[in-house]
Amino acid sequence: MATHAALASTRIPTNTRFPSKTSHSFPSQCASKRLEVGEFSGLKSTSCISYVHSARDSSFYDVVAAQLTSKANGSTAVKGVTVAKLKVAINGFGRIGRNFLRCWHGRKDSPLEVIVVNDSGGVKNASHLLKYDSMLGTFKAEVKILNNETITVDGKPIKVVSSRDPLKLPWAELGIDIVIEGTGVFVDGPGAGKHIQAGAKKVIITAPAKGADIPTYVIGVNEQDYGHEVADIISNASCTTNCLAPFAKVLDEEFGIVKGTMTTTHSYTGDQRLLDASHRDLRRARAAALNIVPTSTGAAKAVSLVLPQLKGKLNGIALRVPTPNVSVVDLVVNVAKKGISAEDVNAAFRKAAEGPLKGILDVCDVPLVSVDFRCSDVSTTIDSSLTMVMGDDMVKVVAWYDNEWGYSQRVVDLAHLVANKWPGTPKVGSGDPLEDFCETNPADEECKVYE
């Protein structure tokens, strides 16, 4: 019988280069437009390679040959396996809801299908505000009103419903699998649970959850802990926690965080007042576009929800400022490791940005300002020139984030993770055929290359 090596010589062109295991280490359940995939794949950077369970019985070279044939022959790009898509509803078509839809629309091989939005403004508002956005500009997709309860996005129909009571939403009738809860109102178990009662199977809260019964996930930090049976309601944390947690993880792993404080200089949001008016927070009651507004944030404490070892070690505040988008975190920590330099700290971030946090964390060496980070896909961008070390154990790190677009990209990623873990759904591949093959065939001889 021919050996694997002999088979390989007949199936795989000798000039084909396999990507290294770290060449695209962005979390396997998703892909962003900044993700660089291996030369062999022939996939667009927004794609995910699907690897069906039935391929487990094939040899490694059968799997690779199937991935390579089109590319080697100079034909069209390799396509992922077509599977039934999960039906998604967006509850609350505000800043995050509309950003989420745009981000999802950009993922051409998404396992999701947005089929309905709940917007109190109806089809006219939903279509107009999706198409025309003061921050994002005009949506390149074709957005039309089909009838008094449906809009279309590039020809795809999306139903528009209007109800402030989740119990009255037609999730059962429409067969909704996942609800993106974007109102900021239904953030606890009883509130978000109304979507489950209405017929949805899973709920992703796009805000910090209230209650210890709702697990929180930050992509790049603890998404590996998610499983389909863990919970029906989960939280994507806040935009600030998504910025802070990845680089706090790097700092803690490399240098050991002892304690620290964080300040986020945060763009104003819809929770503030345009002009002075009543608000439960007397500072947020003041005109958002005219003031620097100190206020509370649970982002630093919430880091412990995804990095339990940091519980009680971090706290912080927010300064809301008169900018409409993009925010910046300033973290100061004492670390256990002594005698480090700013270069050491930045080197740790660069290593993470090219490795386990690729697509999540970036490092910027150019002296930029907030507007330059609009529509940044990553969760956090370290401003390397602002990294400081005082004495032998105090570290200051400054990181930028698009609190709307970047955060919404992570909501899409988390929804993709939920889809990837859905029972009976073919698993989305990492993009590396060898890695995918060895995950399901660890005893195979070819997998010893990883030892």
UniProtKB/Swiss-Prot annotation:
It catalyses: D-glyceraldehyde 3-phosphate + phosphate + NADP(+) = (2R)-3-phospho-glyceroyl phosphate + NADPH + H(+). The keyword Plastid applies. It comes from the Eukaryota. Keywords: Calvin cycle, Chloroplast, NADP, Oxidoreductase, Plastid, Transit peptide. NADP(+) binds at R95, I96, D119, R164, N403. GO terms for biological process: glucose metabolic process; reductive pentose-phosphate cycle. Pathway: Carbohydrate biosynthesis; Calvin cycle. SUPFAM superfamilies: Glyceraldehyde-3-phosphate dehydrogenase-like, C-terminal domain, NAD(P)-binding Rossmann-fold domains. PROSITE patterns: GAPDH. D-glyceraldehyde 3-phosphate binds at S238, C239, T240, T269, R284, T297, G298, R320. It is an enzyme of class 1 (oxidoreductase). Belongs to the glyceraldehyde-3-phosphate dehydrogenase family. Tetramer of either four A chains (GAPDH 2) or two A and two B chains (GAPDH 1). Plants contain two types of GAPDH: cytosolic forms which participate in glycolysis and chloroplast forms which participate in photosynthesis. All the forms are encoded by distinct genes. This is Glyceraldehyde-3-phosphate dehydrogenase B, chloroplastic. The gene is GAPB.
